[in-house]
Regions:
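A short, surface-exposed beta-strand/turn
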Residues: 80-92, 164-186
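Acidic, serine/threonine-rich low-complexity disordered tracts
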Residues: 185-194
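Long, charged/polar, surface-exposed segments that mediate recognition or autoinhibition
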Residues: 86-129
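Exposed beta-strand-loop-beta-strand "reactive/processing" segments of non-cytosolic proteins
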Residues: 50-83, 138-171
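N-terminal short leaders/motifs
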Residues: 15-37, 111-120
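Bacterial Sec-dependent N-terminal signal peptides
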Residues: 1-27, 46
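Short helix/turn-capping signatures at newly exposed starts of structured segments
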Residues: 24-67, 74-78, 85-98
Length: 194
């Protein structure tokens, strides 16, 4: 009986820690900064990659204890968000896309996830995420296809099931399989009306 009890307790502990790692909270704070506050390596990479983009805005972002710099700009008709670490090294590029722009396999995989996990859901925003070596990502942004770039999809959605109703951010792979899910925590000042 004691052995069964210990196994039972270990199983419960494992399940609880697995769920807590899988569904963490996301609290993100952004504030506008001048270009001079951004590492020169980030500015140089951005200038080489998006040479013809006249306007861009820089932000300092704090999320989950990490600090990064983010440039937001419009390129070829789509909104791009380019994120760099504190040293100015490229982390990823996120491009706002519609559901129809996703590959069919990714759409089907996401639909299966939403249908089995939620009684109701509504997609708020989809961003195609590009990661890889900076020079390869640059080539893809400039229109050259490359196999070394990893494509993922960051999806903000409202989800409702028997247990909860919340705003979530899910990271899906190119097959539409959920890799990570975080509950988006809105600060009270995010919703102030003036």
């Amino acid at each position: 009986m004691l052995i069964l009890s210990v196994r039972y307790r270990l199983s419960i502990l494992f399940l609880l820690t697995s769920f807590s790692l899988f569904a963490q909270n996301k609290t993100e704070v952004e504030r506008s900064v001048s270009a001079t506050a951004v590492p020169s390596a980030a500015r140089a990479w951005l200038h080489e990659t998006y040479a013809s983009t006249p306007r861009l805005h820089w932000y300092l972002e704090r999320s989950s204890g990490e600090t990064s710099y983010e440039a937001k700009l419009r390129h070829r008709g789509a909104w791009h968000s380019v994120e760099f670490d504190e040293d100015g090294t490229l982390q990823d590029i996120e491009i706002i896309v519609g559901l129809s722009a996703l590959p069919e396999t990714a759409r089907r995989g996401m639909a299966a996830y939403f249908d089995t996990t939620y009684t109701k859901h509504r997609i708020r925003k989809i961003q195609q995420q590009l990661t890889g070596p900076p020079e390869v990502v640059r080539a893809v942004v400039q229109g050259e296809p490359d196999e070394e770039v990893t494509y993922r999809y960051e999806v903000e959605f409202y989800g409702k099931n028997r247990r909860s109703k919340a705003l979530w951010e899910g990271l899906f792979d190119d097959q539409g399989q959920l890799l990570e899910r975080k509950r988006i925590v809105l600060r009270p000042t995010d919703n102030l009306m003036y």
